């Protein structure tokens, strides 16, 4: 199977798609472009096979998550493409464009939310523990690896929180402060803003 990967900024996607159509006859196209619906492309050409894929940046380490939506790929070809993306991490198949938009805002953008949060850890450790940046980042990386392993083995986030937060202990104090400052609502608003923007991009084309 020969496929063409469409991986450009949304503002350049339609022109790039038209160039692909000029140079390939009935191409098999996998779009990595955020926001733009399959129907937007298919209106320009309904003979090509087309699907959307939305990986996140951890794919380059083989630990990514990729959402796939099959618009018009033959089933056998879709399976082959899915197999390719599975080499870069977990693959999730969704059944409509809207779910790709949701995935983009939550999982596609997800690493940046964690990185932003971890900057607070980095800043605090460097200031209080007098450690250099390299050591602090190694500590944070191992912290996140441990979190990931805990989720894989247990899975229940409430149980994992209870296992760390002793009554009247340091973790409980920290969690109470985060809750009183509406951390969950802040994250919810951030996720909703990203999903909204993904849908706005879709409506621009």
Where in the sequence are the language-model features?
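Internal alpha-helical scaffold of NAD(P)-dependent oxidoreductase catalytic cores
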Residues: 41-49, 65-102, 113-153, 197
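NAD(P)-dependent Rossmann-like dehydrogenase/reductase catalytic/cofactor-binding core
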Residues: 138-141, 145-205
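Glycine-rich beta-alpha junction loops
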Residues: 34-36, 55-59, 107, 142-144, ...
């Amino acid at each position: 199977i020969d496929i063409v990967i469409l991986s450009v900024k949304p503002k350049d996607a339609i022109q790039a798609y038209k160039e692909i159509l000029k140079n390939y006859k009935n191409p098999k196209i996998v779009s990595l472009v955020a926001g733009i619906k399959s129907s937007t492309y298919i209106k320009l050409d309904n003979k090509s096979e087309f699907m959307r894929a939305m990986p996140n940046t951890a794919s380059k380490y083989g630990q990514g998550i990729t959402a796939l939506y099959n618009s018009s790929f033959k089933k056998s070809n879709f399976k082959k493409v899915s197999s390719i993306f599975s080499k870069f991490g977990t693959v999730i198949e969704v059944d409509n464009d809207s779910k790709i938009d949701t995935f983009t805002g939550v999982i596609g953008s997800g690493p940046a939310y964690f990185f932003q949060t971890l900057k607070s850890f980095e800043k605090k450790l460097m200031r209080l523990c007098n450690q250099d940046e390299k050591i602090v980042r190694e500590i944070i990386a191992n912290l996140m690896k441990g979190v990931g392993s805990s989720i894989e083995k247990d899975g229940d986030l409430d149980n994992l929180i209870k296992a760390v937060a002793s009554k009247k202990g340091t973790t409980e104090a920290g969690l109470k402060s985060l809750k009183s400052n509406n951390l969950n609502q802040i994250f919810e608003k951030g996720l909703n803003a990203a999903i909204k923007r993904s849908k706005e991009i879709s409506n621009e084309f």
